[in-house]
């Protein structure tokens, strides 16, 4: 009798853990978003960190004397904190100006992780 209660308790605990795991939010947003093509000949011309708990969405803009050829947006704490949605809202790659809008996935109003935006320009 005692062992059947133990087995029942273990089965119930396993069922509860499976249900809890199924309710955790899944993130399909990547930890890194890239625009353009990385090249060793490019120079880093911009670096900015959007800190955790800042408002989402947030826009990052930059005007360079030379063309911006590659942009890397990365979540600094990926995993359960998820990724980030990034899109070019003004300007373009291989142009001297660009505006990138960053959004926390899941319609949250604050970023759950630090986000780093790095831009690389032509020499």
Regions found by a protein language model. Give the residues of each.
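Cleavable N-terminal signal peptides of Sec/SRP-targeted secreted and luminal proteins
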Residues: 3-22
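N-terminal compositionally biased, intrinsically disordered segments and leader/signal-like regions
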Residues: 10, 24-29, 38, 67, ...
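General N-terminal targeting signals
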Residues: 18, 90, 117-119
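Extracellular receptor-binding modules and their adjoining Ser/Thr/Gly/Asp/Asn-rich linkers
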Residues: 21-55
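Extracellular attachment/recognition segments
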Residues: 54-107
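Short, structured beta-strand segments at or near domain termini in extracellular proteins/domains
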Residues: 112-123
């Amino acid at each position: 009798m005692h062992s059947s209660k133990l087995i029942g308790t273990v089965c119930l605990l396993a069922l509860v853990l499976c249900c809890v795991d199924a309710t955790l939010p899944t993130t399909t947003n990547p930890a890194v978003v890239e625009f353009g093509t990385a090249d060793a000949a490019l120079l880093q011309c911009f670096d900015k960190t959007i800190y955790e708990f800042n408002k989402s969405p947030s826009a990052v803009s930059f005007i360079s004397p030379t063309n911006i050829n590659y942009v890397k947006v990365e979540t600094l704490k990926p995993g359960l904190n998820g990724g980030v949605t990034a899109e070019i809202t003004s300007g373009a790659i291989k142009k001297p100006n660009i505006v990138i809008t960053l959004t926390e996935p899941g319609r949250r109003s604050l970023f759950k992780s630090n986000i780093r935006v790095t831009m690389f320009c032509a020499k």
